[in-house]
Structures are given as C-alpha cells and as structure tokens.
Amino acid sequence: MKIFLSSHGHLASGLKSSLEILYGNCDHITVFDAYVDENSVQEQIELFFETVEEDQQILLISDLYGSSVNQAMSMYLDRPSTTLVAGANLAFLIGLMGRDSITREELKDLIEQSREMLCIVNLEEEEPSSQEDFF
C-alpha cells in the first residue's frame, strides 16, 4: 500500500514527522504541503502516480473534506485500487502503520476508531475504551 497525504500548509509533513518519530522510516508515505510554494496538488499527485506499481493499493488522504486539496485528489479516484479519505489525523495514520493493504471494512473501522480519539479529556472520566485496543 502506498499513501499520498496532502494538506493545506505543513500539516501533512508534520503528521509524517510524528509517524517517523514513533515508527521510523515511512517511505511508503508521500506528503505534499499545499499552498506553501508554487507546486500544485495535481502536479504532485501525477508525480506520485508515476511511482505506483500496477498491483499496489493506493490511499489518498486529505486534511479536510470538500476542500480544494480534497477536490483535487478526488479527480484520481478512477485510478485502479485507489481510495480517498478526508480528515487526516495522527490516530488514523497510526492505525495504517504496518499494513500492506486494508479492506474497505477495515478502513471504515479505523476511521471510527480515529474519530473516538478526538474527545474532551476530563480527569474524572475513564479514557475511551478503544484507546487500549487502538495502540
């Protein structure tokens, strides 16, 4: 599985930096920080797809559903074995680590788990039950 992660500003490279601190080398993840220079999302996705092998599963991940970055990435959904996920967060990306592939059902479960990691933390409440299972 190859991953293309893009965001407005430096969020994408920051998320990859965090993953590399936790997991080491993440060569299977290509990042593009949009709107920080003259390069476009479309140009970078085209370069990314030049590195993709015919039988590889592709996961495109954007920071925000419906945004310009997400819309640009959606133009590539007609490519074989390509899926687009919006709303990148570190919990979601951690769940992808160590996987060679992921089914649609597993992807839905991982998205739900990563949503649960976004919560208000109160001292008197227990941590979400899925947190132990997640890590």
Regions found by a protein language model. Give the residues of each.
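N-terminal loops that bind phosphate or other acidic moieties
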Residues: 2-135
